[in-house]
């Protein structure tokens, strides 16, 4: 049959033609249309075109998003971007991403690395200098960067007030020169920092200079003579710029900005005049360079540092002086007249000009007055606010005002009758001062409780001398006089009289081995719940009660005296008195030796330990597991009898706080609805009609703790809800997988599933007040997931324990499939293990009904737990959960990760080919058959979870029979 060539369209014969994709070609035409290479006879072209494999890949194959090279075979698709297997790496750790990943700003991060975003940099600080005009003054509105203190005599004097305003102005060079005086009450002024002053250089054509007059009176005259006084300005040739801190500083004059001020004159001025120094900024003809300005600022800073050092040295000297010598401030003239009249003497012997130089022997009951610091006080009785206290006096002599008088005694007998001078009034400092605050009420109480002091003062030369005050300035409480304790008399020990050995009773013989064996046999019938120690007590012996002799010691007589009995010990007040029967049992007659000493009684036989009989430990725990009662459950498993074990009352109260919440839909429970509807229809009705079937929690009732785990949709926190440890899963809008519909579906499914089932965690409720911050609360299992338990090789797992864990998972999945729910994400990470090795299945966010799952394609889940039909695009059904359970069974027996050291994006290819993890050689045959039946390629041949539960039950029963035979 003749046909035409697909390339040249000529008719070809049967002997010289090739067929590809139902198209005939000549031999010479059957070549690649791009590289013109010969194609093999069995070539099958893609896209109905004649192209070799290399050319096909170059034109039609997808390119890697990272390397931009074509992808030949297996590729990784993430976020609609294709990668090579080796190119899909984490940006942070540069490792191949296996499993989950995080995506942010078109960058991929592995689940182990956090998305690190550098914090935004703060805006740069730019100092904007004002632009000077020719006919108007401009003021600095923006705050200056730094504060540089200027050397002035005001630094050596305490400031008058800390709230004095500080104003600065810069005036340009004009016809009418204006200067602004800056009053520095705190001895500081603000100037630009050295690295910002260079910006002032190009701010305008005007030139500014800094000058400081000698006093406040000269500041007014500086404005009129600033234009014609070059000494007040500074330039390169100024001595102030060259070396303001030279040897001339040590003399009596100091240089400040080119003006010389006499220190002696300045110190003699009053406080108001010498505490103010003016700084005028006026224009000048020469233009200072940038180096001059930097040099000037450096010298000013150096000058201020030296001044601060001097002030600190002075302050330390004053503090050291105050510690060694206590200075007392005298009362002032501003005191009220009534208070001054109280201290006036009644004797006219002393005149008004007489002064009191010193006191002596003040009352010891009064505490020493505190040191008055050199700070400003608000008490009007001491000083006004505009005055400052001088430095504390170096001597202890307190001088009185002339208005106060003290009578002069006419004789020595009248010395004791003179009234003592009143103590100085202690000021109440302001909150900003650092002086000691005296509690007047406490001082008055101490004075009222003390007796009147004895007259111990002595007047010498019309003055009263004081003893040196204590070095400490703190107010100490009055020391009480120490109590005198008399030594206790030593007890008189009387030697015992000689004893007659014939009258002494003999000690009981020790127990024989036969008696001990009889006591052992008699105690075997008394079984208790805990180990007990039984010590046999010898039979009591009669004792003769005798009182302790109180007579004086006498020589022993030759007659046969009765042996004195030792004194009976008196019981303490804490020990309850014994009954007469108990006293008779405990009384044992002592045995005396010929010398009079007491012979010790023979030691009792060794204690007899009676251990409880061992019973096999129960493996399965009760169904109603409560995590807060884990200690109680552990004790219940360790003890043999369970009747004597009761949970603490506090735990019972905590568990009774949370009432069981049974969800209802239109007044009907889930069991009633499942008779007429499927589970998916019920969930769809709840979500569409927005019916709230779960308990609404208040955020204040939940206490959040540390983060336990984090995933793509949110984080899991450890918390407390009504006295019980809970797990709080938070869904935040910040996560890229956040979806409110998924949250509603998961909460609805967890509410409908029976929370009392032993293999599910208990669900307490959810909170949806904040749409961007949702969370639900469930039971906390502290032991962790099944994967953590399996990978921890230090914890041994018996085969019976492994079977029990597998049975719990199968029972949970059997309950889900019975109501028409498939889990769809069953894996070892979604199985929690309690302290008694009970398995609990969690994470129902991806659960769907069987009917809907048939029309769904694969878009979620972990690749190593997914069945082969999912990679072919088939629907998800119950058999997919069975395949995942087969992988979990292999993990339990092998205690390894499935497909270890293999890229997760290459696992689908291996699963589709039929590659499965290798079953260990020591795995039992029945268990191995169950694993192979669960992960077979044909879904119809996989067993159901009901059959799996029956198989595991038979395996465990056969294992117990083998144990009992042994």
Curated annotation (Swiss-Prot):
Residues 208-291, 331-588 are annotated as: Disordered. The keyword Kinase applies. SUPFAM superfamilies: Glucocorticoid receptor-like (DNA-binding domain), Protein kinase-like (PK-like). PROSITE patterns: LIM_DOMAIN_1 (PS00478), LIM_DOMAIN_2 (PS50023), PROTEIN_KINASE_DOM (PS50011), PROTEIN_KINASE_ST (PS00108). Its EC number is 2.7.11.1. It catalyses: L-seryl-[protein] + ATP = O-phospho-L-seryl-[protein] + ADP + H(+); L-threonyl-[protein] + ATP = O-phospho-L-threonyl-[protein] + ADP + H(+). GO terms for molecular function: ATP binding; metal ion binding; protein kinase activity; protein serine kinase activity; protein serine/threonine kinase activity. GO terms for cellular component: cytoplasm. It comes from the Eukaryota. InterPro entries: Kinase-like_dom_sf, Prot_kinase_dom, Ser-Thr/Tyr_kinase_cat_dom, Ser/Thr_kinase_AS, Ser/Thr_Kinases-Pseudokinases, Znf_LIM. Residues 232-269, 374-389, 513-526 have a biased composition (Polar residues). Residues 3-62, 63-120 form the LIM zinc-binding domain. Pfam families: LIM (PF00412), PK_Tyr_Ser-Thr (PF07714). Residues 419-430, 490-511, 561-570 have a biased composition (Pro residues). Residues 211-231, 270-284, 331-350, 431-449, 543-560 have a biased composition (Low complexity). Residues 702-959 form the Protein kinase domain. PANTHER family: MITOGEN-ACTIVATED PROTEIN KINASE KINASE KINASE 20 (PTHR44329:SF288), SERINE/THREONINE-PROTEIN KINASE TNNI3K-RELATED (PTHR44329). This is Probable LIM domain-containing serine/threonine-protein kinase DDB_G0286997. The lineage of its organism: Eukaryota, Amoebozoa, Evosea, Eumycetozoa, Dictyostelia.
